[in-house]
Amino acid sequence: MAFMKKYLLPILGIFLAYYYYSANEEFRPEMLRGKRVIVTGASKGIGREMAYHLARMGAHVVVTARSEESLKKVVSRCLELGAASAHYVAGTMENMTFAEQFVAKAGELVGGLDMLILNHINYTPLRVFSNDIHLLRRSLEVNLLSYVVLSTAALPMLKQTSGSIVVVSSVAGKIACPLAAAYSASKFALDGFFSSLRTEYEATKVNVSITLCILGLIDTDTAMKAVAGIYNAEASPKEECALEIIKGGALRQDEVYYDNSILTSLLLKNPGRKIMEFLSLKKYNMERFINN
């Protein structure tokens, strides 16, 4: 009976509340109207489509990528689509100093920050891993470390607005995928870092949500070229994928699954993990870290 009161009943209450509110909360485009949003990796593909969706919703959009010419076109199109404002800052996320300075610059451009969408990646060709440590290091730096730098730099602004961090990841960060060892390692690391960070935020009363987006194969030009003749699967549309990512961030969901197969979300969603996180957290004295 004591075990039920201490563990089972709180767990049941958490899950019932979670599913009730998740089922009854609907996304509305006006949730993003006037919001200040950063999108990285926004010169093409999913990032560009997210910028366009946000523009249609009336958000203030700041985009970044390496190609200045491409970013100029994205900003121009965002303004045509109805963005409250649109700005770009070109640079590479291989440079951690740039990553940190970019967040500060973006905050100056739009007067703060409500949502940070981390979408950029280091491209890695599909091939058998053969002691390419340079490739692995670069993947970890761009796909993980720069995400940490960006989110850390953005946190003071996001605390002020009870904002959101949206992390674009992959099925390759949930299951073993051949020919993508370096990429997969960086995506598994994203899950580990940001899922742990979410738990810390919740326990220390930091009202900033973290949404991890688990994507399957999406029909971007880069992805289609990478898998041609190697991987046989139907790709999902990037436009719809981009919208689902934004919805998940706006609704402050823990995870978003987007793939052409319903099996992806059914098999990868793990309620047991949430239970274990809850039980584990009970063993920590988190009160000493609140407001520190």
Curated annotation (Swiss-Prot):
Substrate binds at residue 170. GO terms for molecular function: 7-beta-hydroxysteroid dehydrogenase (NADP+) activity; cortisol dehydrogenase (NAD+) activity; steroid binding. NADP(+) binds at residues 41-67, 92-93, 119-121, 183-187, 216-222. The keyword Nucleus does not apply. Its EC number is 1.1.1.146, 1.1.1.201. PROSITE patterns: ADH_SHORT. It is a single-pass type II membrane protein. Glycans are attached at residues 95, 207. Residues 1-7 are cytoplasmic. InterPro entries: 11-beta-HSD, NAD(P)-bd_dom_sf, Sc_DH/Rdtase_CS, SDR_fam. It is found in: Endoplasmic reticulum membrane. One of its GO terms (biological process) is steroid catabolic process. It catalyses: an 11beta-hydroxysteroid + NADP(+) = an 11-oxosteroid + NADPH + H(+); corticosterone + NADP(+) = 11-dehydrocorticosterone + NADPH + H(+); cortisone + NADPH + H(+) = cortisol + NADP(+); a 7beta-hydroxysteroid + NADP(+) = a 7-oxosteroid + NADPH + H(+). Controls the reversible conversion of biologically active glucocorticoids such as cortisone to cortisol, and 11-dehydrocorticosterone to corticosterone in the presence of NADP(H). Participates in the corticosteroid receptor-mediated anti-inflammatory response, as well as metabolic and homeostatic processes. Plays a role in the secretion of aqueous humor in the eye, maintaining a normotensive, intraocular environment. Bidirectional in vitro, predominantly functions as a reductase in vivo, thereby increasing the concentration of active glucocorticoids. Homodimer. This is 11-beta-hydroxysteroid dehydrogenase 1. It comes from Ovis aries. The gene is HSD11B1.
